[in-house]
C-alpha cells in the first residue's frame, strides 16, 4: 500500500464505522485525551474490551494492519525501562503491527490514534510507548514480513493526565489571519496530537486548491507522529481527501 493510498483517501470514515459518533464528539475526545502513565490495578471490563476489539478489527480490515489488544499482561511494563519511563500498573496494551513498508510508521500513527480516541470515548486512558517497555515472547502474533512498531498502554488511569506545553500554530503551519477556518481548526487539533517527547516536529502547509502538505521533521518517531497529526487534523478540519505530496 502506497502512502497516497494509506493516508490520502477518505479513511476518516473508518472511525464512524466503529461507533456512532459525530465530528463534534471526536473533537471533544481530542481535547479530553492526555497521556497517562499510571494505571489502576483493574482489568478491562468485558463489555469495554469487546468494543475495543471490535474497533481494532474494523480498523485492521480497513488499513491492512495487524493491530492486537493484549490484556492482563503486566510483564511488558515491569522492567527497568518501564520504571524509567514512570509507567505503573500497566497490564493492558495495544500492539501496532503491520507489514514492513516505507509508510508503516505513518499508517500505524494514523490508525493507532483512531483507536486511542475510541478508547477515550469508552472511558479509558492511553499512552503511546516507543521504547520504555519489554517485548514478551508469545503474547502477540507477528506474521511473516511484519514488524512491531510501538505499543499503546491502555486502561483506567489513576488520573486523566494533564495539558502539556505546546508550540504555536504559526510554528507548525503557514497559517495566517486570512487562512480558511477549516485549516485553522485542523491545525488547532493537530497541536493536541501526542508526539514523541512532546516534540511536535511537523509542519502543515496550506497549498493551492485547498490541499494540505504535511511534513515530518527529524526526530524519534517523527513519521509515526505525522500519522497521528494527520488523524487529528482531519477531525479538526472536518476534511479528509485533502493531502498532497
What are these regions (language model features)?
Residues 4-245:
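Acidic, surface-exposed loops and disordered segments
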Amino acid at each position: 500500500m502506497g502512502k497516497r493510498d494509506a493516508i490520502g483517501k477518505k479513511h476518516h470514515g473508518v472511525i464512524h464505522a466503529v461507533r456512532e459518533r459525530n465530528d463534534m464528539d471526536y473533537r471533544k475526545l481530542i481535547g479530553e485525551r492526555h497521556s497517562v502513565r499510571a494505571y489502576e490495578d483493574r482489568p478491562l471490563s468485558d463489555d469495554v474490551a469487546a468494543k475495543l476489539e471490535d474497533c481494532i478489527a474494523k480498523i485492521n480490515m480497513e488499513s491492512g494492519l495487524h493491530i492486537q489488544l493484549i490484556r492482563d499482561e503486566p510483564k511488558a511494563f515491569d522492567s527497568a525501562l518501564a520504571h524509567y519511563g514512570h509507567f505503573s500498573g500497566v497490564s493492558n496494551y495495544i500492539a501496532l503491527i503491520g507489514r514492513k513498508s516505507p509508510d508503516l510508521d505513518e499508517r500505524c500513527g494514523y490508525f493507532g490514534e483512531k483507536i486511542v480516541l475510541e478508547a477515550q470515548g469508552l472511558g479509558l486512558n492511553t499512552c503511546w510507548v516507543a521504547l520504555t517497555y519489554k517485548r514478551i515472547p508469545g503474547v502477540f502474533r507477528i506474521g511473516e514480513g511484519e514488524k512491531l512498531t510501538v505499543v499503546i498502554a491502555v486502561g483506567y488511569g489513576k488520573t486523566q493526565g494533564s495539558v502539556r506545553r505546546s508550540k504555536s500554530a504559526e510554528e507548525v503551519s503557514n497559517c495566517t489571519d486570512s487562512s480558511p477556518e477549516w485549516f485553522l481548526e485542523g491545525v488547532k487539533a493537530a497541536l493536541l496530537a501526542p508526539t514523541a517527547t512532546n516534540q511536535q516536529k511537523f509542519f502543515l502547509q496550506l497549498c493551492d486548491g485547498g490541499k494540505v502538505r504535511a511534513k515530518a521533521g527529524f526526530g524519534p518517531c517523527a513519521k509515526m507522529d505525522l500519522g497521528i497529526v494527520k488523524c487529528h487534523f482531519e477531525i479538526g478540519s472536518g476534511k479528509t481527501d485533502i493531502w498532497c505530496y
